[in-house]
Amino acid sequence: ATHPEKLGSPLTNKDITTDFAAALVELVTPTIDSAEGLFDHLSDLHHFLYASMGDELLWNFSMPCAFGSESDIRLAEYGNSNTGMLKHIYRKGLRLRYGSIMQCVSGIHFNFSVSPESWRAISSSPSQAFIDAKYLGLIRNVKRNFWFLLEHFGASPIANKSYLLDRSHALEQYGETDLFLPSATSLRMSEVGYQSAIQNTLGIRYNDLGEFINAVVRGINTPYDKFKALGLLDEQGMPQQISAGILQIENELYDIIRPKRTGASTSRPSNLLRRHGIEYIELRGLDVNPFIPEGISATNIKLLDLFLMHALISDSPYISEQEIIEIRTNHSTMVERGRSKDVQLIKAGSLSNIADVRNIFHAELGMLAAVPYKQ
């Protein structure tokens, strides 16, 4: 599929662009201060998109549809400018490193920021250092409580056989064409989903902004033998990946949440963060809701706001090496068995039944939700 001309340029259109593939459309909303307003805008984008698609339909599931061959997946193109070519070569690198089908896994990215007025309600004179520390605390708490999002937003327990190809996995047969895990919440967030195991070696803990930036830059500058062996140029002598680093660019960091800062397209994200600090966070671990045309509802958005506000205002100690292991273990447990009633999560070094963990967390969210809201 090619990008319809009616949708404008995927390089410059701020509302409708493409992700990895030409057929993988990405809808982008502006910053909006209400769940209803955000949902209405997203719904409008869907209506406009459908009016421009002819006989094509949107696939409303995070895991890709059936593929005959990975060669059928056409990379997104952005023209011949330096910026456009860099975006295309980056995608060629993703295809080379991970395969095209993995890159067609899709989800919801939810950006969250606190207004200047709200920061002043928290602190009489909020410096950028204060804001950075609070956002990092939010990120740490999201990682600690990601089980909650997997439970409420996980919607991909099944995948077509063609997604796995010849990869090893522990999924079970479901019908003639699909594979699944009976108690899974999100195969998208599992080891067979949108992941890169080598990135765990970067040891990112979000305890300090400078530490985070240095780890990402180290990932860009550190060659990985497997990627190096693939070569920077293809058989025709054309670039097929930006570099042989663990990360080609900052955006290749696959995590459930990332700190972000807007700026000129010519500026590196790591430099923007280092110079200006965190402007907002990007929550990436949300599956597309297959039962809603827009992939997310206004009620879902309100729940995310509540969850993220809880993460922002709650105590958030630094993440230790031991807690990294606990967070990763809980993540694996929830993506693979999160629908099972006897699931246990590690909390403070000991196992707790998910029902007990859920009751405590729901009570905390309930107290926050009861606070009168002033817009």
Q: What do these predicted regions represent?
A:
Residues 29-38, 116-118, 287-296:
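A generic structural motif
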Residues 102-115, 280-287:
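Histidine-centered divalent-metal-coordination microenvironment in nucleic-acid enzymes
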Residues 42-46, 50-53, 262, 266, ...:
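Short, hydrophobic/amphipathic alpha-helical packing segments
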Residues 274-275, 281-370:
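Substrate-recognition/cap regions that form aromatic- and gly/pro-loop-enriched pockets
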Residues 38, 69-75, 122, 292-296, ...:
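A short acidic (Asp/Glu
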Residues 374-375:
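C-terminal amphipathic alpha-helical interaction region
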Residues 1-95, 102-108, 130-140, 144-147, ...:
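Terminal catalytic/cofactor-binding subdomain
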Residues 79-97, 104, 113-275, 293, ...:
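Loop-rich catalytic cores of soluble enzymes, especially ATP-dependent carboxylate-amine ligases
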